[in-house]
């Protein structure tokens, strides 16, 4: 996908996001994980609706972290452009995943370029359904994400709705059903995310980070 040119006030490497309102994220299926259950570092391809590769996402974690903490593990996620330059960085610290411990819910810091904070994703305390807040670099809530009561994709897609602060729905984050074999023998996931075309590019990037947190 060609890089849009002349985008003012846009972090380098995020120009792609100004011209799209939907992204598809496909996790690479690792044969070692499928046959042995050994947890490998996750890798993803980020595409537009035409199937063109926009970014690559690579998890940076230690083996012990992956095996001991599983899906709740802390991680750093590097987002690379088509030239293999790191343009986004997601950091998720180790936190408790239980709603019964509201003092240490899930959180993620989003930086672009790496080292420059552009937003945060924070889990909100909720008993029945998963709730998250998308925040800007100043910690101000911009969007809210609300998930379903059941977040397991048993035989269908799982949708998380995205709302403005006044309750207007503006997008979705969807975990897509990938079939019986892939769902039961690997943790490889496919996701879709959509948002308004004119949404601030930093908020779009933070929503992409939310996809890896929820």
Question: Where are these predicted regions, by residue range?
Answer:
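Low-complexity or membrane-interfacial segments used for flexible interactions
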Residues: 1-76, 82-87, 92-107, 113-117, ...
